[in-house]
């Protein structure tokens, strides 16, 4: 037995590597001075340029499938959908001010809403359908951007919405949205292009106000940001002017599109100047924003949601 122990001990010694544990492969030689100088010249502006180019390349991946969605609605006499888009966007904007959400949350939620509505533009949309979709979009955006996520009850604006939805209904809506949007939630919006240090309140308010008008949906996010930055820059020496040429993509945006977007944003800016209350994050609800309640019993409403939006009858037995 002792011989076996000695043999085992000797084998262990054979496996022992008698060398300094701190010895390692010698470090590689330093790069040539030219490379060190090039690496040292990388500035925050260069990093911003790379981020800007990345956003410009990706922005159309998060655009609507129907480029001129507003024109499509008008041509097909879908004025109710066009009207409900503005109402839903106004709710998102108001929720941002009421709950203290980040502006990025409102822009992302509006992007989810517009993409989902354009994908399902063949549906006959009703007020309650747009309501539950908008709440689902806002809930997903909060989970992506917010540190403190509001409850599903708080996300519903009882003073403006005609319905109050159960948490299970909103969670089902979230799954439907994720599938329809192919889980692409980290989207590129006009807010993505705004510089953190030089962005003014006017720029942010202009872009938030543009969410209410579906006519702006046909323009690239970078072009919308460039138009808002131009109007909020008081002098040609303003730092925002340096961004404009980088935001406008000459190969994908014609001069006509650039001028049209700028003129529309300018008209919006003038309207906000004449009516300062409209640019507030706490808009007053006009009669057009008051949704008429959908008067049916809970089972019919629940089955209608299931049939129209979820494509399943499994929710039929429960009420909203």
Curated annotation (Swiss-Prot):
SUPFAM superfamilies: Cyclin-like. Residues 35-44 have a biased composition (Low complexity). Keywords: Cell cycle, Cell division, Cyclin. Signal peptide: none annotated. Residues 1-46 are annotated as: Disordered. Residues 24-34 have a biased composition (Pro residues). GO terms for cellular component: cyclin-dependent protein kinase holoenzyme complex; cytoplasm; nucleus. GO terms for biological process: cell division; G1/S transition of mitotic cell cycle. GO terms for molecular function: cyclin-dependent protein serine/threonine kinase regulator activity. PANTHER family: CYCLINS. Belongs to the cyclin family. Cyclin D subfamily. This is Putative cyclin-D7-1. It comes from Oryza sativa subsp. japonica (Rice).
């Amino acid at each position: 037995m002792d011989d076996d122990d000695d043999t085992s001990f000797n084998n262990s010694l054979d496996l022992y590597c008698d060398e300094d544990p701190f010895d390692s492969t010698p470090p590689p030689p330093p790069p040539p001075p030219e490379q060190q100088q090039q690496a040292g010249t990388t500035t925050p502006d260069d990093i911003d340029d790379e981020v800007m180019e990345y956003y410009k390349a990706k922005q159309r991946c998060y655009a609507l499938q129907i480029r001129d969605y507003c024109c499509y609605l008008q041509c097909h006499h879908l004025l109710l959908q066009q009207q409900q888009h503005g109402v839903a966007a106004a709710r998102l904007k108001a929720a941002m001010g009421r709950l203290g959400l980040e502006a990025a949350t409102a822009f992302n939620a509006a992007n989810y809403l517009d993409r989902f509505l354009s994908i399902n533009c063949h549906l006959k949309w009703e007020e309650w359908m747009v309501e539950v979709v908008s709440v689902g979009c806002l809930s997903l955006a909060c989970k992506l951007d917010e540190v403190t996520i509001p409850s599903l009850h708080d996300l519903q604006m009882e003073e403006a919405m005609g319905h109050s939805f159960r948490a299970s209904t909103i969670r089902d809506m979230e799954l439907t949205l994720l599938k329809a949007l192919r889980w692409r939630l980290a989207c590129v919006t006009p807010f993505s292009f705004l510089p953190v240090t030089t962005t003014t309140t006017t720029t942010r308010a202009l872009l938030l106000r543009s969410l209410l008008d579906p006519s702006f949906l046909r323009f690239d996010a970078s072009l919308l940001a460039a138009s808002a930055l131009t109007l909020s820059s008081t002098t040609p020496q303003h730092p925002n002017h340096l961004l404009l040429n980088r935001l406008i993509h000459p190969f994908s945006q014609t001069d006509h599109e650039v001028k049209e977007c700028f003129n529309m944003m300018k008209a919006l800016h003038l309207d906000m100047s004449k009516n300062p209350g409209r640019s507030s994050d706490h808009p007053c609800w006009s009669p057009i924003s008051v949704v008429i309640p959908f008067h049916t019993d809970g089972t019919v409403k629940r089955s209608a949601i299931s049939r129209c939006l979820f494509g399943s009858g499994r929710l039929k037995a429960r009420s909203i």
